[in-house]
């Protein structure tokens, strides 16, 4: 009997833990709906949640929404692949080589202090207003979180483990595969999660550069016609896509770090 009670108690606790993060958003939506229905909020300023859902549904069934999401997701993934890939490679290089770090790290840190958004006028002069400009902004923005975390992840590996690996006769590649990369992986994945959140922020601005498709274009176009409900749909889409990217990064983190004590149940 007591065993059954414990099972039910654990199940109730797990359900409660899953529902807890959604309590505040649900309460916020209810208050928002009440304020809109009672006239405290003008629809021109902040439409009711039901109006936003209606706008979302119309965009969905028309196929327009999927087109914009597909374009934005493609830009985000390609920018992340380019910027993140370069950040990972240079982070591994500078983290492993004192000569490369001395040669390159100071320059990269100086560039890091330049806000990516401040580069917009120069990017337009360089690349015009086509896709290259948008991808460049996203790639530059996501480069540094992955570079810095990879660089510091390599440096945080216990030197005694590396020496032990050398004493066992491991080659340089084996040291990387068995000791250095696994030791740096937690830090690298933190950089990836940060970059996945940042990519959508950068994309919002990048898609205002004379885009013809994408969530940013949809939002800016709706602003021109005072369609506040569509603007909110675009904002919420960025939030949902960012959350989805973070969840996928967490799943990847659990898979790659399944050997780590902190990720074992």
Set out the residue ranges of the language-model regions:
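Transmembrane alpha-helical segments of polytopic membrane transport and secretion proteins
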Residues: 1-24, 247-265
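Periplasmic/extracellular loop-to-transmembrane helix junction in inner-membrane transport proteins
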Residues: 7-14, 38-81
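Transmembrane-helix boundary motif in ABC transporter permease subunits
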Residues: 78-108
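C-terminal transmembrane helix and the adjacent membrane-cytosol boundary/short C-terminal tail
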Residues: 98, 186-190, 232-265
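Generic hydrophobic transmembrane alpha-helix motif, especially the helices
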Residues: 109-145, 152-153
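Glycine-rich helix-loop "coupling/hinge" segments at transmembrane-helix boundaries
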Residues: 124-125, 154, 201-238, 257, ...
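Transmembrane alpha-helices
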Residues: 136, 140, 173-205, 229, ...
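Short helix-to-coil transition segments within interhelical loops
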Residues: 154-160, 164-184, 224
């Amino acid at each position: 009997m007591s065993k059954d009670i414990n099972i039910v108690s654990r199940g109730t606790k797990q359900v409660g833990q899953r529902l807890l993060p959604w309590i505040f958003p649900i309460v916020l939506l209810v208050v928002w709906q009440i304020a809109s229905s009672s006239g405290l909020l003008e629809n021109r300023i902040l439409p009711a949640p039901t109006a936003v859902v209606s706008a979302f549904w119309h965009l969905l069934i028309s196929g327009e929404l999927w087109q914009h999401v597909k374009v934005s997701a493609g830009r985000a993934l390609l920018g992340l692949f380019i910027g993140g890939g370069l950040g990972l490679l240079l982070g591994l290089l500078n983290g492993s080589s004192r000569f490369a770090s001395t040669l390159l790290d100071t320059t990269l840190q100086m560039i890091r202090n330049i806000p990516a958004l401040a580069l917009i006028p120069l990017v337009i002069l360089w690349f015009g207003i086509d896709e290259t400009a948008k991808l460049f902004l996203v790639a530059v923005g996501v480069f540094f979180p992955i570079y810095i975390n990879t660089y510091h992840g390599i440096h945080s590996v216990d030197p005694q483990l590396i020496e032990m690996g050398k004493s066992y006769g491991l080659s340089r590649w084996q040291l990387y595969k068995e000791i250095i990369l696994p030791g740096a992986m937690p830090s690298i994945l933190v950089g990836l999660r940060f970059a996945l959140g940042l990519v959508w922020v950068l994309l919002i601005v990048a898609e205002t550069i004379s885009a013809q498709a994408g969530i940013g274009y949809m939002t800016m176009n709706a602003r021109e016609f005072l369609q506040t409900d569509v603007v909110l749909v675009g904002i919420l889409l960025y939030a949902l896509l960012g959350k989805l990217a973070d969840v996928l990064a967490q799943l990847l983190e659990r898979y790659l770090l399944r050997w780590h004590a902190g990720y074992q149940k």
